[in-house]
Structures are given as C-alpha cells and as structure tokens.
Amino acid sequence: MNEALDDIDRILVRELAADGRATLSELATRAGLSVSAVQSRVRRLESRGVVQGYSARINPEAVGHLLSAFVAITPLDPSQPDDAPARLEHIEEVESCYSVAGEESYVLLVRVASARALEDLLQRIRTTANVRTRSTIILNTFYSDRQHIP
C-alpha cells in the first residue's frame, strides 16, 4: 500500500467513498477512462488495500439503537496484560474500539436501546475486560464517517 495514488486513482477513491454502489460505467465517465481501465484500477486499489470493502450505512435508530455513547476505558491493573480489545470484541454493542493517547487507554463507540441497556453494558465491559469506564452519551451526530482523500 506504499505505492502513491495518481490523480485518476484519487478520483476513483473519492467517488467510491461517496457512493460505494457507483457502477464501473459511472466511474469511467467521472474519471475519463474506459470501463475496462476503471475495472482494472479498482481491482488494483482493492488488492493494495486502499479500498477495503463496500458496505451499507445503517441508521442505528432504525434498528433500535436509540442511544449511542463513547466509553473511555482504562485497565484497573496496569501490571496485567493489556488485552481489553480482544476481551470486548465479542460484545455486539461495541461498534468500534480505538487505542488513544491520554488518560484512558481506549475509547469505544457503543450503541444500545436505552439508558438501562447502557448501564448493563457498562457493567459487562467492566467485568469482561477488568477496566474502569467513563461514558459520554452522544446527543446528536452532525456528521460521521467523513473521509478526507487529498
């Protein structure tokens, strides 16, 4: 993935980031290339790991996740192995786990149905990973999943 992107690759990556369902024909028009050239470039971007997959964006509220929160976690015993991400990976309500610099070791993005469900989840996180937690409930999301592609 060290190979630099040329201008055409950047166009294709920007277009795919904006609409992962864009057809090869649409991409070809936007990039000024033939469909076969675009297909070859997209395959190369995929094999290099620049394009890592295609997925649908689901509205969390539409599937019953009415409450989202950031949960910062810190191991209770720093002398023990730092394996919190692996211990929490199976918990479905944990959408993302980020290693961070600062007071906490990790920040989790969690989605649950209610405040009570968050309380239960926090207890599971504490018990499963032997961590302390600090939660911030998300009131409104103005934007997310933005990708800057120079």
Curated annotation (Swiss-Prot):
Other notes: Can complement a M.fortuitum lrpA mutant, which is attenuated in virulence and persistence in a murine infection model.
Name assigned to this protein: HTH-type transcriptional regulator LrpA
Start and end residues of each HTH asnC-type domain: 5-66
Protein species of origin: Mycobacterium tuberculosis (strain ATCC 25618 / H37Rv)
Statement: the UniProt record of this protein carries the keyword Magnesium: no
Assembly, per entry: Homohexadecamer in the absence of any added ligand. Homooctamer. Tetramer of dimers. In the presence of phenylalanine, the hexadecamer dissociates into an octamer, which further dissociates partially into lower-order oligomers.
Activity control note: The DNA-binding activity of LrpA is modulated by interaction of LrpA with various effector molecules, including amino acids and vitamins. The DNA binding affinity is decreased by several amino acids, including phenylalanine, tyrosine, tryptophan, histidine, leucine and aspartate. Preferentially binds to aromatic amino acids. Besides amino acids, the binding affinity is also reduced by vitamins, including B1, B3, B6, VC, B7, B9, B12, VA and VK3.
UniProt keyword list: DNA-binding, Transcription, Transcription regulation
